[in-house]
Amino acid sequence: MRVALISTSIFALCCSSNVRAEAVLPVNPSPYLVGAITRNMFRVPKPDQDLVLLSAHRGSWEVYPENSAYALQDAWNSQIEAVEVDARFTADKEVILSHDYRMERESTGTGFLYDQNYSQVQQADLRDRHGRVFKDSRGRNAKFMTFSAALDLLAQYVTDDGHGYVMIIDVKGAVDDQDPTDPIELTQRCLDILAAKKNPKLSKAVVFKLKAKDAVDIGTFLNRTTYDPNVMGGLIVVENPDDQNVKDSNYDPHEDTIYDQWNVAPFPVQFEMNQFYKGDGLQAYLDYVDQKQGFATYHESNYYPEGVANSAGKCCFEHNTDPRSVAHGGIVPDYRGEPEMAIVNRTNLITTDWPDVVADMLRQLGRRNTSKLSR
């Protein structure tokens, strides 16, 4: 296995894109310490805590294209302490940032990302959330970013004295039988690219996010990659990767052996859940008194038409949502876009497409004391 990892590392170093990221917006210095961000991210949440962290999902893409350099910088320049980006392979194993595995919704390109080389992908221009081809005030289009370029962009915010922001990497797996992506291989490639930067402070600003249903999955991840919890910023586990995983209202997390496994993990692990509707049994875990690890929630935004675009770039993704709701026109409503549902929960981190709105809500509730991130 170690030989395989070394081979992967050599491949990554010789084949990764050499294009460095240009700052498309001004680089405003961060008032936050990276160590303070990750420390608060992975502590045990308390009902009376006065700081809930925010992660801008795919950056700030109200105006800018999602997962673009513009979206990342706009979030950081707005002093949102973390952004979450999506990592995928192209056909020639370049790691790029893209939520979808089809190109049409996000860009002027067509077809599957895993069928196209990076040089082909770079011919496409990114769209904004309304489907319009993006141009900035200087007439520049936005392009798909490589993971390497995203790291270079983050590095411009990470300083020698420890200030900076955090980037969370959501590693995407295979989406169909034709997609050859192995999420472990993709994660290792990301680790190789990061290691090649030879920047320990940058490594501490990167958090990986993966799907895992139990401790066996985590063990597989640790055995098959060079991930080192002493080097990286941290690890977030998506506990409910199955969109049908909605708990009954009488669900008792104290009887769930999976959560007991997370509680005894030998290093900090934060696990994240999508809460599907108010009263979902997952709410019980948010108030779980025996919780010993960090906890995060995510809610999606219901842009018109109602629903959430899936990774094929199609609308709408039929989640198993509130059984009391009634679907209209064949679309199953998805109520996770209500930020009010997330801010009342006991959680360390909220990943949101509305970081500015949720930040204001938390501030009004006395739960956005970001002065803690400066010490």
UniProtKB/Swiss-Prot annotation:
Keyword Iron-sulfur applies: no
A Pfam family assignment: GDPD
Keywords (A to Z) from UniProt: Plasmid
Cellular component, GO, one term: plasma membrane
GO molecular function, one term: glycerophosphodiester phosphodiesterase activity
Alphabetical list of InterPro entries matching this protein: GP_PDE_dom, PLC-like_Pdiesterase_TIM-brl
GO biological process: ethanolamine metabolic process; N-acylethanolamine metabolic process; phospholipid metabolic process
CDD domains: GDPD_AtGDE_like
Stretches assigned to the GP-PDE domain: 52-301
Keyword Transferase: no
SUPFAM superfamilies, alphabetized: PLC-like phosphodiesterases (SSF51695)
Gene3D superfamilies xrefs: Phosphatidylinositol (PI) phosphodiesterase
Domain of life: Bacteria
Protein name: Uncharacterized protein y4eD
Organism expressing this protein natively: Sinorhizobium fredii (strain NBRC 101917 / NGR234)
